[in-house]
Amino acid sequence: MKKRIFLIMLLTALLMGGSTLTVNAQTYPPKHTPELEFALQLKVTLGEAFSIDNTQHGRRTVIPITGGTFEGPGLKGTIINGGADYQLANDKGRTELEAIYCIKTDDGVYIHVRNRGIIANGKDASGKPKFYFKAAPQFEAPAESKYGWLNDALFVCEPEWTQEFKGIVLNVWRVK
């Protein structure tokens, strides 16, 4: 039994050592950078926000999602009233967001959306103020529908504010 354990440990050490050598032999940064492909734009209308101050985790703000529209290559439709963006802010200028809502395509297909992200007010390396707002929406579409591809990809998004639209505009890209 002791011999068997020793052999397993020796084999594990050799395998780990080999993989370490392989990792160290790679060049950094990697030669390949993931590509992004535009997927859709969401124009989200919002209701009046309310906050729960001083929770054990920070300040919780809830922003109702009241509707809107979306459009991209091969998909178009409306944002369903009834979702919300749940934000949790700390005292260091960082906010975690989690928006949960549904969209409905023009051909009647409902798709669930869960969008998690970070809003941060900080400073760059030179000390200048910087604003960071990125999120990663996940889609849950009927698997056998023409929108099933939304289930099998990673997405990133960032906001765009315009004076013409009083909500938030989110531009969404698929990571190829």
Please place each PLM-identified region on the residue numbering.
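Beta-strand-enriched cores of mature, soluble protein domains
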Residues: 26-176
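Bacterial N-terminal signal peptides that target proteins for export
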Residues: 1-9
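Bacterial N-terminal signal peptides
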Residues: 9-19
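Sec/Tat signal peptide C-region and signal peptidase I cleavage site
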Residues: 20-25
